[in-house]
UniProtKB/Swiss-Prot annotation:
Gene name, Swiss-Prot/TrEMBL: lepA
Domain tr-type G: 2-184
Binding site for GTP: D14, H15, G16, K17, S18, T19, N131, K132, I133, D134
Protein name: Elongation factor 4
UniProt similarity note: Belongs to the TRAFAC class translation factor GTPase superfamily. Classic translation factor GTPase family. LepA subfamily.
Lineage: Bacteria, Pseudomonadati, Pseudomonadota, Betaproteobacteria, Neisseriales
Gene Ontology biological-process entries: positive regulation of translation
GO CC, alphabetical: plasma membrane
Membrane topology per record: Peripheral membrane protein
Protein task: Required for accurate and efficient protein synthesis under certain stress conditions. May act as a fidelity factor of the translation reaction, by catalyzing a one-codon backward translocation of tRNAs on improperly translocated ribosomes. Back-translocation proceeds from a post-translocation (POST) complex to a pre-translocation (PRE) complex, thus giving elongation factor G a second chance to translocate the tRNAs correctly. Binds to ribosomes in a GTP-dependent manner.
Catalytic activity entry: GTP + H2O = GDP + phosphate + H(+)
MF (Gene Ontology): GTP binding; GTPase activity; guanosine tetraphosphate binding; ribosome binding; translation elongation factor activity
Source taxon at top rank: Bacteria
Alphabetized CDD domains for the sequence: EF4_II, EF4_III, LepA, lepA_C
Keyword Transmembrane: no
Length: 597
């Protein structure tokens, strides 16, 4: 056990974590050259394309160190994006150490800081590594100073390497052996193994990635999941070197995979503890929490007969992604569809893209919303995640909205722009810290302002230099109202929004004029109105297309012309009563593009 090292890599997007992992695998001979592809551990196409890591993967590598001993290095790959922070904390809790990989030309970014603090809170040893030192813009001294200023760990003499060209990779491996502690645990104690990740395989069912903390797990053992109390039998055990290698048993300190007869991902929850039925542990390992959806959106098939296909596709995605929640819902405007819950905006985009790419679906997505807590006058408390489900204004005592704490790292010259943006979004400044050339801003922001377009605006006001990390803080009361859009006198439920009273009139006007441009002209006038309750705050008209009925009258009497025009008017009036309006997909996306001021 003293020769085992469990570690993961913490890095911001694009700082070279997957490339470094590839180098480790190549250096330790985990795969031969013909099997090496770039980004071996990112197995989904979308992970490779966006260059992000979504699911955790592992590799168990045997490394012969300079002291002549062979060490087993278990690399647990972690996602770097805000939305997947729970997966990151699970990956980190399975390790004793973490490599903090920082791009030597770009320096420290917000997500690196957040994940690094998570690691320090979990008591994980953090080892700084500077990557990309072969770039002309690399400035290792400045970045070492930044790591010290911002994160507060000693970075002088941090290992320098370039994962792309392979310089210094061996030094990094030596550093892992030297700095990261060996796992502790008792092989003879009752079994406690934490589920770091789980995914669905078409042949064997659910594959769980586990880290054994105490005890030993063997083939054919009967095991129990402690949060769901489900019991099952061990069918296969083994490790990934990224290829899977079968083993007879896994002992305390080891990381590997476990396959049982479980078919549903919901039974093997990430962060849960596995123990033996025969000799169970008295209590589970700490840190398990149910994943909460933060952002909701409606997904509707463009063709209504694809509804069942969409349900199948969502169920298949859910097999691999337990944090995706969905339930059927009906909208008058869009027909049958699903209300889905996501971890964040990136998660929403990825699910949408996977549905379109892997399952060939054509989708309409409504504007993302967050969960509101509504206290009714009779004292009852309900959760509303869909604006069209908000009860009547008269019966509501207060509406509480979710507030997040955002940490923004930004170069000094863009601080003003970013602060202006946060104030526009109703943010409250909590803290501001100067660290070298960077400034760390902490703001409490309403979450529904963030899900709209905050991220894009943050990037554009700071020329792409600002980076953001956020976590949920609390629900707090706020002056919110529901804004309805009416087309031809009928409310379109899928276009309803919950907005703050201050920006309601402005939002209503903007939306109405946006809709006017997007709704195709019909043979009759269409009124597009924005309403708060029964009060109309904005109106736009989509002009009718009309035929020139006077074309055939050359000279002639005015009464003849009047008669034809009156006849046309009456016809248009009749059409307006029976006509209904098709609302195009682009109109639903218009909500996202409406600015606040």
């Amino acid at each position: 056990m003293k020769n085992i090292r469990n570690f993961s890599i913490i890095a911001h997007i694009d700082h070279g974590k997957s490339t470094l992992a590839d180098r480790f695998i190549q250096y330790c001979g985990g795969l031969d050259l013909r099997e090496m592809s770039t980004q071996v551990l990112d197995s989904m196409d979308i992970e490779k394309e966006r260059g992000i890591t979504i699911k955790a993967q592992t590799a168990a590598l045997n490394y012969k160190a300079r002291d002549g001993q062979v060490y087993q290095l278990n690399l647990i790959d972690t996602p770097g994006h805000v939305d997947f922070s729970y997966e990151v904390s699970r990956s980190l809790s399975a390790c004793e150490g973490a490599l903090l990989v920082v791009d030597a030309s770009q320096g420290v970014e917000a997500q690196t800081v957040a994940n690094c603090y998570t690691a320090i809170d979990l008591g994980v040893e953090v080892v700084p590594v500077l990557n990309k030192i072969d770039l002309p813009a690399a400035d290792p001294e400045r970045v070492e100073q930044e790591i010290e200023d911002i994160i507060g760990i000693d970075a002088v003499g941090a290992v320098q390497c370039s994962a792309k060209s392979g310089i210094g990779v061996e030094d990094v491996l030596e550093e892992i052996v030297a700095k990261i502690p060996a796992p502790t645990g008792d092989e003879n104690a009752p079994l406690q193994a934490v589920i770091v990740d789980s995914w669905f395989d078409n042949y064997v069912g659910v594959v769980m990635l586990i880290r054994v903390k105490n005890g030993t797990i063997k083939l054919k053992d009967k095991v129990r999941f402690m949060s769901t109390k489900a019991e099952t039998q061990v069918e296969q055990l083994g490790v990934f070197t990224p290829k899977s290698v079968q083993k007879q048993e896994l002992k305390a300190g080891e990381v590997g995979f476990l396959i049982t007869g479980v078919k549903e991902l919901g039974q093997a929850k990430v962060g849960d503890t596995v123990t033996l039925v025969a000799n169970p542990a008295t209590e589970p390992l700490p840190g398990f929490q149910e994943v909460q959806s933060q952002v909701f959106a409606g997904l509707y098939p463009v063709e209504s007969h694809d509804y069942e296909a969409l349900r199948d596709a969502l169920e298949k995605l859910q097999l691999n992604d337990a944090s995706l929640k969905f339930e059927p819902e009906v909208s008058q405007a869009l027909g049958f569809g699903f209300r889905c819950g996501f971890l964040g905006l990136l998660h929403l985009e990825i699910v949408q893209e996977r549905l379109e790419r892997e399952f060939d679906m054509d989708l309409i997505t409504t504007a993302p919303t967050v969960v509101y807590e509504v206290v009714l006058k009779n004292g009852e408390k309900i959760e509303v995640e869909n604006p069209s489900k908000l009860p009547d204004i008269g019966s509501i005592e207060t509406i509480l909205e979710p507030i997040i704490t955002a940490t923004i790292l930004v170069p000094q010259e863009y601080v003003g722009n970013v602060m202006t943006l946060c104030n526009q979004k109703r943010g409250v400044q909590v803290n501001m810290q100067y660290m070298g050339r960077q400034v760390m801003l902490t703001y409490d922001l309403p979450m529904n302002e963030v899900v709209m377009d905050f991220f894009d605006k943050l990037k554009s006001t700071s020329r792409g230099y600002a980076s953001l990390d956020y976590h949920f803080k609390e629900f707090q009361p706020s002056d919110l109202i529901k804004l309805d859009i009416m087309v031809n006198g009928e409310k379109v439920d899928a276009l309803s929004l919950i907005v703050h009273r201050q920006s309601a009139v402005h939002r209503g006007r903007e939306l109405a004029s946006k809709m006017r441009e997007l709704i195709p002209r019909q043979m009759f006038d269409i009124a597009v109105q924005a309403a708060i309750g029964s009060q109309i705050i904005a109106r736009e008209n989509v002009k009718a297309l009309r035929k020139n009925v006077l074309a055939k009258c050359y000279g002639g009497d005015i009464t003849r012309k009047k008669k034809l025009l009156e006849k046309q008017k009456a016809g248009k009036r009749r059409m307006k009563q029976v006509g209904n309006v098709e609302i195009p997909q682009s109109a639903f996306l218009a909500i996202l593009q409406v600015s606040d001021k």
